[in-house]
């Protein structure tokens, strides 16, 4: 599902201009990380993708749908949004009901809903927790319930808002596994993140925002190697990227595998 953002401007009530002429194209199946300081426009931008916000001017197309002309409930069939705080998203009495709500609300058959729920629970390692109230689970597991409730809707585009915030190392690994599996399935995955190492290890394209505009946009290695430009939006390159630069490696590296390979050259 292609995303086309054309000259997008957005001004909040009170006159705060949050987005200033953003144009981006995201192809089906891309894995894109949005980075930048607080207030750079990341969350405002992605909330235009599922219709939670409407452009002041410009347009956002999700496939052939103009978000200004399509209801939020209908857009949910194409764009799934996992909130930063799962407690803002969860409301059902047990995990199974929570994860089934989305596909049922989209009008899927009972058979398809059951299959999607089973798959989402397995992918997020929640199969043994279907009868548990989400609020009896730890925050890390509630995050997985929130992920599962979006995955079960089988939308072509999945947005993660700060997925690793408040998560331990094991939970971050689970989330990375989910991202990798969604990529394998051909889904478009977009994340907003301050976790630059998670971004570097799991996303192929990075868009850096500053003051409501695109500062950098390109392959992760190219963007994350531009420390001086990233500093304008208070983003530091990953630790291994910085180490590689200090060692004088010819290539920009973003993970352990690339770092070790570059050392051998």
Name each region found by the language model.
Residues 111-129:
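Conserved ABC ATPase "signature" region
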Residues 158-161:
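Catalytic Walker B motif of ABC-type/P-loop ATPase nucleotide-binding domains
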Residues 211-212:
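Conserved ABC ATPase "signature" C-loop
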